[in-house]
Each structure stands twice: as structure tokens, then as C-alpha cells.
């Protein structure tokens, strides 16, 4: 017997309802396989490094030759400058005040740290030569310069309010990334 369109939809709907739980489990497993196989392919193609987890009293990052995984692919006409960073490592600095002339890579470096940390904590390889860390429980960013015209707040007032909120919630296991603070 040849089925018409409506009968096909009813059969498919019936199968979906019958195997709904199994299908959801299958889709979940398939999505994880997709994420990790894509991550593995990118890692091989781009020379990414397997991050190392290390036990410590508080969160930290110690990395060599960190790169921005997106910028290095977009700007292929120039050599990407790598950087080293240690944050929260025992007897070392818990923070860095990064300054320099315009367009020298400060924002890219800061975003490189955040992106690579998120990649590491998601179980992916990272754009660095070495990456040792204890996971952070919170990552706060203050990157965009925004005013709030609905509340009649200047960019500076919004920045101060956001910084206050970040500082209230941050602890030893938080990473705070801020770009061009108090420039409004």
C-alpha cells in the first residue's frame, strides 16, 4: 500500500512518541561526539595543546605562547605574536595591569586568555604551547563600552556599576577580564 503525505507524518510522529527517550539520548551522544571530533580536528590542524589540570588552593593559569584562536586565522598575512602569562600561581601575581599604545594587541591578549580558558574548561585543546591551570568557577568580563540611555547613565556610570557588581561577586576562584576600564 502506498502511503500519502499525511499517513507518513502520522507514522513518523508515532515512532517519535514511541522512541522519544531513546532518540533524545542518541541526539545527546551524537552532539558530544560532534563537539569532540570537531575539537580534535581543529587541534590537529592548528597545533593546539592539551591543557594540564593541576591541584591548588585557588584557581590559576600558567601558559606559554598563548594565541587568540580566531584572530590568528583571520589575520594570516601577519605573524601572530604569542604571549606568556601566569595568574594566581603560588607566590606570583594574582592580577595584571596591561597597558600600551593603541593597536598593540592588549585586547587580543586579554581575550586570548578568556577564550583559551573557556576552551580548556570545556575539555578542548587550547591555542598555546603550554597551558597548566586549575579551573575557575566564574569568569567575569567588562569589555564593551556601553551607556544606558534608558536609565540616563553615562558610559562611565555603567562601567562603575558593572565593576562594583563584579567585585562583589568575585573570589579567589574567579577570573576578571576588563578592557579599557573607566574610558567612558
Describe the predicted segments one by one.
Residues 1-104, 108-139, 162:
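Alpha-helical coupling/stalk and coiled-coil linker elements that connect catalytic or binding modules
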Residues 138-184:
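Switch/coupling sub-region of P-loop NTPases
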Amino acid at each position: 500500500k502506498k502511503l500519502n503525505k499525511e499517513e507518513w507524518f502520522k507514522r513518523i510522529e508515532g515512532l517519535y512518541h514511541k522512541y522519544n527517550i531513546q532518540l533524545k539520548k542518541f541526539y545527546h551522544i551524537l552532539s558530544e561526539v560532534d563537539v569532540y571530533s570537531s575539537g580534535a580536528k581543529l587541534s590537529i590542524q592548528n597545533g593546539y595543546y592539551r591543557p594540564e589540570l593541576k591541584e591548588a588552593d585557588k584557581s590559576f593559569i600558567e601558559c606559554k605562547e598563548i594565541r587568540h584562536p580566531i584572530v590568528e586565522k583571520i589575520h594570516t598575512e601577519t605573524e601572530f605574536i604569542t604571549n606568556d602569562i601566569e595568574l594566581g600561581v603560588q607566590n606570583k601575581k594574582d592580577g595584571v595591569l596591561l597597558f600600551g599604545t593603541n593597536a598593540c594587541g592588549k585586547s587580543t591578549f586579554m581575550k586570548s586568555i578568556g577564550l583559551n580558558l573557556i576552551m580548556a574548561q570545556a575539555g578542548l585543546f587550547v591555542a598555546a604551547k603550554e597551558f597548566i591551570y586549575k579551573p575557575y568557577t566564574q569568569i567575569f568580563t567588562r569589555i564593551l563600552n556601553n551607556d544606558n540611555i534608558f536609565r540616563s547613565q553615562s558610559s562611565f556610570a555603567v562601567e562603575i556599576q558593572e565593576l562594583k557588581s563584579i567585585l562583589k561577586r568575585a573570589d579567589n576562584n574567579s577570573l576578571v577580564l576588563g578592557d579599557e576600564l573607566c574610558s567612558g
